[in-house]
């Protein structure tokens, strides 16, 4: 029986990517990488350049872009990737430079290169690199069939110690494969092998074979979406996290229902499966949909209110608001300037965490609900935590009866 070589596996993957409309580009060393990055960045920002009567960046301007990108930790660079950069041009103008289109992720420029040589403490050659707008955002390390997959993971760890630097600090995702087993993980050197994951379909059937994995995961729109929306920059740990497939599909289904139907739904994750991360990402992405006025995350105890706020803040500080009492809840839901001022509320997010008890009080007592007559008719999404406990009884009935344009999603770790 002939065992497929690593080189054959590499060429087969590149052929798959080219078949999915990736541009194959020959990059042998870092200087080639920078030259290609300049061309791709100009292509990606051509509209902004044209508005300013330009076709590209001068060498001095590009050096300033590189200098901006070189500074900071790996975590800070992940933020820079997603932010706009204000470039001061040679003639004194300011223009916006975008490194990644996170809103229309299919509109990024995708390329594939292989065997890029990088000099660090040691000279290393990387197997397959996916470039997005010229930046290396996905690195794939391959081993021939029959070789233990963890050897590819260990090789990535060695690269962290000996060669990754410069633009390669912008890698967001690693993929390792021996052809018959394929796993992916976020660029978090301290995560460990346990944080490498198989991809699956919606029915949890794993895409172990590299060609199956590549045809789905490396679809340009899918990969662009995962990098743009499903990598979490964990502020508490200053590290990158990538969602697992069941988390991805759960959030995608919630988004689909919100955008296209009025159906409710619930998500069941087993204990330890990352329910908090899934619910955070769902709330965050739902809040970004046009026409959604408020997202309310409902817990059934005050201690869970505080705990959830703390956990969400670890993912992204101040992404959500909490409420200490019903008055604050009314102020946040109504957005009334007078009430916000009364409770000294400076900012008011679209996402609010509260208890079912405070919410029930807000909708049943005239003293409070008179301030909610406007929001009760707006599009409101409620996410109930531990919905096997809170999705029943008079409180739930009162809340559902009050809001006229309400859509509900429940999360639980207990089978319903």
Range-by-range predicted roles:
Residues 177, 354, 411:
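Short glycine/serine/threonine-enriched helix-capping/active-site loop
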Residues 160-162, 283-284, 336-340, 366-371, ...:
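A generic local structural motif
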Residues 313-365:
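Inter-Walker segment of RecA-like/P-loop motor cores
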Residues 149, 357-416:
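Signature of the SF2 helicase/ATPase Hel1-core->accessory helical subdomain module
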Residues 28-30, 324-325, 413:
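Proline- and acidic/polar-enriched loop/turn elements at helix boundaries
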